[in-house]
Amino acid sequence: MNLKQMLVMSAMTAATLAQPVDAQNAPFIGRQRADQVAQTVKNGRLTPEALWGMGRIGGFALNQQGNMGVYSVTYYSIKQNKSHSVLYSYDMNTQESKCLTTSTKSEGGGVFIKGGSKIAFLSSESGSSQVWEMNPDGTERRQLSHEPDDVLEFLFSPDEAQVILIKEVESTTSIQKNDEDLPQATGIVCNDLMYKHWDQYVRAIPHPFVAAFDGNKISGTFDILKDEPYECPMLPFGGVEQLAWSPDGRQVAYTCRKKTGRDYAISTDSDIYLYDIQSGQTRNLCKPADYKEPEKNATVSLAQQSVNQQEGDCTVGYDQNPQFSPNGRYIAWTSMARDGYESARTRLCVLNLKTGSKTYVTESFESGVNEFCWTPDSKGFYFTGVWHGRTHVYTTNLKGEVNQLTRGDYDYSLLQALPFGRGVLVKRHSMSAADEVFTLVPEGKGLRIRQLTEENKAFYDQITMGEVKERWVKTSDGKDMLCWVIYPPHFDAKKKYPALLFCEGGPQSPVSQFWSYRWNFQVMAANDYIIIAPNRRGLPGFGMEWLEEISGDYSGQCMQDYLSAIDDLCREPYVDKDHLGAVGASFGGYSVYWLAGNHDKRFKAFIAHDGIYNTQQQYVETEELWFPNWDMGSAPWEKAANEQMQKAFATSPHLYVDRWDTPILCIHGQRDFRIEYTQAESAFTAARMRGLDAQLLLFPDENHWVLKPQNGILWQRTFFRWLDKWLKK
């Protein structure tokens, strides 16, 4: 469980306190029985209620022998409007799992310690989140840490004599403290940028603390970033994967962007630092000791400044997620070459700790590295990457010889290498099934795939999923574009079905074989819609030229790609071309707002979730300013900056409102600081002022996503009521 998941879990727990449910007497939220599943499935089809009833598998860790695992699953109660994370053990020999959690308090982050005789985990059973231990059968639970504040995550050293605890510390770099004699004042005085991030006002940031562990208790905690105003792990999504112990336990490698305020807001330049436990000295592994930060123009895109290019061994983009080789000779991490560009190709960098030489071992791979882990012999890696709408597992050695390990219409994510060089532990999902845990074991030229968990079997046994097909579409400029088409269950080609164009967000996130608990294609298909999901310009997995063509051209070829996709689908006799809808979130919401004024009457309904309506407004409202700086070309007041900037703001969706002629539903979370909810309010107001049928759905307590069960159900019901009203009449 990473920091993001822990924060979400804490938020859900806090939200529960406001509910009229006695936490002490609340029912245990866990895996649903087959009869409970039957109450949420409708005519053998997936429903929003069934979707929220499914278990969501988190981390899975093996013991050193590889014969026992521990993993977490999060369940949701619509009635109680909260989640509950529980731990399971898994016997690799008998293939049996056992629930270890007996409390209504959430537990997670399970790992084996003491040679596999104990499981360490996080629990809030004592009133705050602390590190506990228990036997592999769940007995003899005992609290190990007694910190005065919450432990968000932990990481034991290889010899287990020390442990890293992730805890929050006060931050006053952007928000100053209010006067002490005004304890009930709610005003927020901000002195610099990054006063808000994702969905929080930044009054606290995570820091890594190192503590001693004598086998009985965790004590002697000290902050390795003491008096430094920087976050580690990096907000908003970084977790303990951004830190690593050296095999001898003498050093800690950590990820950090040592910037604050405006400097932080315009830069993606994070580095890998090596902290020596004994001396307390820190060394930057990404830059030379005499490196001086170049001066940057904050209102001009870094793409136009010399600071954004890697020079020699000095890296200036995202460097994160360090891992030492098992033999201690190397350290590896993921690295981007350009500052201010969060979608640059992620390469796997390997540093020889003795010679200081760096090697990029995935240069021959045409896409970016998502996750990686060392092989036990320290001679290579497993890693995942997106290619042609699928996320697969690959291998590479230290020479950079890359080979694809997995095939099929799936998305994989790595968990850990199996001990003794036997393969790798992964999670796998598709557009038709949620995450389950598998082992991959190479055998000669083949691969043995073994499924370990069947968390949601009771659902799949009662649900018929729609067929998912790959479809290649010719774009308006003559390129070939991969689209996924999802058909309703029991599809009949002799009938006509309304169709939806799905507009992906990001704007550089892949339309791979993803499974979503909100934007779920199978729920849409279960409502008798055909969905086409294009891998339009700007998405990874089709080479860097395809990926980067969207930067500075939001309203250009990528929009034509959308229209090419829906026009191609409409050639099929079973598609009702008079009843088409376009839906999307984030950049997908931008796409919907833009298409609303440029669709030539193709669509009969639009839905935009957390979308950008006004690009000029977005530039000064969002918090991570490197993003609009790069993609829009510069600040809107830099009149003569460049053609890219002028086009980005001159083609903003709000400038086409005079052409809007179609009903539109605008959805937004009011805790969304990435794209402010005022964008949806503005779009809704414009639509109603023009006399269009429109609806506005606001969530005062949600961010860029919808995380609470009852809000999620309301989202789905509103979504389909709107589509059905306009596309099924």
Regions found by a protein language model. Name each.
Residues 49-85:
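Beta-strand-rich domains and repeat architectures in extracellular enzymes and scaffolds
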Residues 55-69, 104-122, 141, 148-163, ...:
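Conserved beta-propeller blade repeats
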Residues 260, 446, 455-578, 585-586, ...:
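Cap/lid segment of the alpha/beta-hydrolase catalytic domain
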Residues 91-95, 135-139, 213-216, 276-280, ...:
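Short loop/turn segments that connect beta-strands within beta-propeller blades
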Residues 26-35, 84-85, 168-227, 255-273, ...:
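Predominantly five- to eight-bladed beta-propeller fold
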Residues 520, 525, 533-729:
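Active-site-proximal cap/loop segments of hydrolase catalytic domains
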Residues 75-79, 125-128, 170-173, 259-262, ...:
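Short glycine/acidic-enriched loop and turn motifs that connect beta-strands
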Residues 34-55, 219-229:
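A short helix->beta-strand "capping" segment at the edge of beta-propeller domains
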